[in-house]
């Protein structure tokens, strides 16, 4: 007899999304966490979103997750990054009140129907005949369930470093989970070691902001959640500030390399490539005269500021000296020192696309345990794992997104097919079809799924369907109606500040001009006057990027057709030029019957599939000739 349908281990960003989704989908869910007060804690930087990460938050929101909604409720500053660039690479970012975010997330978990929260450390997975049956906690209690989702963050065998001092913690002040890590190893899962870190926090009264650059938020502020009403969204926004390291800072750091844990061999785990510590930056980029440091508020009261860009595990005296060498921080009082943390993770090639482990049935992994870094990557995985665990409990088909459907699809596909030996971070460059996967169309791509799972209200789906009809009608109107260079039309274009036309031109072409905006589009026809802001924005983007969007859609279609291609029986993979030895070895071992089956094999890249497809096609032509 089982106590719960789903057990979630860990109350961080992945665990919250997993537990919330599972419970909302009707599964009796248990969230086990070391400290209830720390559910939803933002352990590192006080921000949500950013380039590519903002896409993930929007996708979480469209699927019915909670990260975007809570961020809108406790954000301190909202900005659109890359606002001057194309819509595919723009990213929403928000500074958050870390205290309010944590409290809101904790209260959400404590009040969600079907969700039970308990403060207990899990020490062991109960596994019989290759399937997980539940967990055993530190106090000796057993909980039985149909599914278990591990969202343990940095707590698996966590080790904190400040100078030559180490402590067994999953986060400063909280114990690490050593026995649970041993339990995973005993099950035959490939466990590795990674490292991440955080920056010092400074008392606000000790900072001289007058000598720093000020960075305000955007007006109007861009919210994350589609459910947030833009016209009513008016959060109190606080500025961030910028200072810089200098040659004195670098000399202080260089002269203490012999005391840096990452250089002495004390730290063995591999750190994030794209978020290196300041000592690593000074060592690797010797030609750089300075590095930018963002001084960011942590709460609405702004009593502490976070030094973004100054991640470090240097001894406390070195941290004090290097911080006080920078403009505006000469009298800085450190409230909390920066530190590095090593932790265990499971190589994600151990997972299916549902995030269930291949070796242990009914066991799902999500978040940093899979080798990722970032709140957004964790939350997205947690949501996917929670949905899939709940669907499996109900006996329904799994939920797997393709690379052309969502950044979440790219994220999971990268992890399970390629694995990772270093903390994985999402970038827009990882998505081949990024023009189709914009922030602004996340609801149009994914909200239907959220509604199908019961995570999104019916009202939101109806509003989406209405907008889809408006968009279709608007694009048809633009394609099928034309403007001629008549006196009236030329006067109309001049009134809008648009260049004149010399020949008959479709309104789609005119609307596709860089200078053409929503206000001008509304003047073309009553059809656009009545359209919602969301729908109007989609029409304009479709008009401006019509040919590029069409090319990507055709590319997606070609890929889907390619995956249907059968691999001839007895095919000799060694004869295919351009395939690596590793790829050939895997293809020979699994002998996939189709290119789709080949794509499911860990380590088989889209480029490898292209090469294989071309060779099969050429072989087929030769046999016909």
UniProtKB/Swiss-Prot annotation:
Annotated Pfam families: GIDA (PF01134), GIDA_C_1st (PF21680), SAM_GIDA_C (PF13932)
Keyword tRNA processing: yes
Positions that bind NAD(+): 271-285
Gene Ontology terms describing biological process: tRNA methylation; tRNA wobble uridine modification
GO cellular component labels: cytosol
Superkingdom, natural source: Bacteria
GO molecular-function terms, A-Z: flavin adenine dinucleotide binding
UniProt entry tagged with the keyword Flavoprotein: yes
Similarity field: Belongs to the MnmG family.
Protein name in UniProt: tRNA uridine 5-carboxymethylaminomethyl modification enzyme MnmG
Organism: Wolinella succinogenes (strain ATCC 29543 / DSM 1740 / CCUG 13145 / JCM 31913 / LMG 7466 / NCTC 11488 / FDC 602W)
């Amino acid at each position: 007899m089982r106590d719960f349908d789903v057990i979630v281990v860990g109350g961080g960003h992945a665990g919250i999304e997993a537990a919330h989704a599972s419970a909302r989908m009707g599964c009796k869910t248990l969230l086990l966490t070391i400290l209830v007060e720390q559910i939803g804690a933002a352990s590192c930087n006080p921000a949500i979103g950013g380039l590519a990460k903002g896409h993930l938050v929007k996708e979480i929101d469209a699927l019915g997750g909670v990260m975007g909604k809570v961020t809108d409720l406790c954000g301190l500053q909202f900005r659109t990054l890359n606002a001057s660039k194309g819509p595919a690479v723009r990213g929403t970012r928000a500074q958050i009140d870390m205290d309010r975010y944590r409290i809101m997330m904790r209260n959400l978990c404590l009040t969600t129907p079907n969700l039970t929260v308990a403060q207990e450390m899990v020490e062991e997975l109960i596994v019989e005949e290759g399937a997980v049956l539940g967990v055993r906690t530190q106090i000796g209690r057993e909980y039985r369930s149909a599914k278990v989702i591990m969202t343990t963050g940095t707590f698996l065998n966590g080790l904190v470093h400040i100078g030559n001092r180490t402590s067994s913690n999953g986060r400063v002040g909280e114990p690490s989970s050593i026995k649970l890590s041993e339990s995973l190893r005993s099950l035959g899962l490939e466990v590795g070691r990674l490292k991440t870190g955080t920056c010092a926090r400074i008392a606000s009264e000790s900072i001289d902001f007058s000598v720093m650059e000020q960075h305000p938020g955007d007006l109007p502020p861009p919210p994350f959640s589609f459910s947030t009403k833009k016209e009513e969204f008016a959060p109190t926004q606080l500025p961030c500030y910028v200072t810089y390291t200098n040659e004195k800072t670098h000399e202080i750091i260089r002269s203490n390399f012999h005391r840096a844990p990452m250089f002495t061999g004390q730290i063995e785990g591999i750190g994030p490539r794209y978020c290196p510590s300041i000592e690593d930056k000074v060592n690797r980029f010797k030609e750089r005269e300075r590095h930018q440091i963002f001084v960011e508020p942590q709460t609405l009261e702004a009593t502490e500021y976070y030094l973004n860009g100054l991640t470090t595990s240097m001894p406390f005296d070195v941290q004090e000296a290097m911080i006080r060498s920078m403009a505006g921080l000469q009298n800085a009082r450190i409230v909390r020192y920066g530190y590095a943390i090593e932790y265990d993770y499971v190589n994600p090639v151990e997972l299916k696309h549902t995030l269930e482990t291949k070796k242990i049935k009914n066991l799902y992994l999500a978040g940093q345990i899979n080798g990722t870094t970032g709140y957004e990557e964790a939350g997205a995985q947690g949501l996917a794992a929670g949905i899939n665990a709940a669907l499996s409990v109900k006996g329904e088909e799994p939920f797997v997104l393709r690379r052309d459907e969502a950044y979440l699809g790219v994220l999971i596909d990268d992890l399970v097919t390629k694995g990772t030996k270093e903390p994985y971070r999402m970038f827009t460059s990882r998505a081949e079809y990024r023009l189709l996967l914009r922030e602004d169309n996340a609801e149009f791509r994914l909200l239907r799924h959220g509604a199908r799972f019961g995570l999104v209200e019916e009202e939101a789906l109806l509003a989406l369907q209405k907008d889809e009809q408006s968009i279709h009608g608007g694009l048809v109107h633009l394609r099928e109606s034309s403007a001629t260079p008549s006196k009236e039309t030329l006067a109309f274009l001049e009134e809008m500040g648009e260049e004149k036309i010399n020949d008959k031109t479709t309104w789609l072409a005119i609307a596709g001009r860089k200078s053409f905006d929503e206000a001008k589009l509304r003047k073309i026809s009553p059809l656009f006057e009545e359209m919602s802001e969301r729908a109007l924005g989609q029409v304009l983007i479709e008009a401006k990027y019509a040919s590029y969007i069409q090319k990507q859609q055709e590319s997606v279609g070609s890929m889907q057709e390619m995956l249907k291609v059968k691999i001839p029986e007895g095919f000799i993979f060694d004869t295919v030029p351009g395939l690596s030895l590793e790829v050939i070895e895997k293809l020979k071992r699994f002998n996939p019957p189709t290119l789709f089956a080949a794509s499911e094999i860990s380590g088989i890249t889209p480029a490898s599939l292209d090469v294989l497809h071309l060779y099969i096609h050429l072989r087929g032509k030769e046999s016909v000739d």
